[in-house]
Amino acid sequence: MDSRTGELLTAAQSENGVYIWTVKNPLYFKITKHHERPFLRNHDIITIQVQFNYNLRKALGIHKCFLTCQIWTRLHPQTSHFLRVFKYQFIKYLDRLGVISINNCIRAFSHVLYDVLNGTIDVIEKHDIKFNIY
């Protein structure tokens, strides 16, 4: 949903993409939170945010695009190591597809968390997307 207007995204907006080799460093990755064994449970909660860079947003007609995932995992990784592996696998998946779009990024989340990384318990995805109105 477009967080500015409240309208649902159309299929054309979510599938609109650009070739991965036309944009340098198209995505920014950062871990915003890492709760290690909260409440003495046997899992970690990691929050990852993926941001589209300026050139990618310009090509797609997007004002702002933050894709955030809150991951419950049985793994107990170091924050930097988890981010490095996640980023590498995410970009590798998109590189194999050849096109970066909002839907392909969401598919990459699912692929990396459920098919590549073992120990994923649950994932909550949140999106903050604003398209250019003008």
Swiss-Prot record:
GO terms (BP aspect): viral process
Signal peptide: none
Short name of one Pfam family: Gemini_AL3
Record key words, sorted: Host-virus interaction
UniProt keyword Hydrolase, yes or no: no
Family per similarity comment: Belongs to the geminiviridae replication enhancer protein family.
Function field: Increases viral DNA accumulation. Enhances infectivity and symptom expression.
Subunit structure: Homooligomer. Interacts with the replication-associated protein (REP). Interacts with host proliferating cell nuclear antigen (PCNA). Interacts with host retinoblastoma-related protein 1 (RBR1), and may thereby deregulate the host cell cycle. Oligomerization and interaction with PCNA are necessary for optimal replication enhancement.
Descriptive protein name: Replication enhancer protein
Lineage, top ranks: Viruses, Monodnaviria, Shotokuvirae, Cressdnaviricota, Repensiviricetes
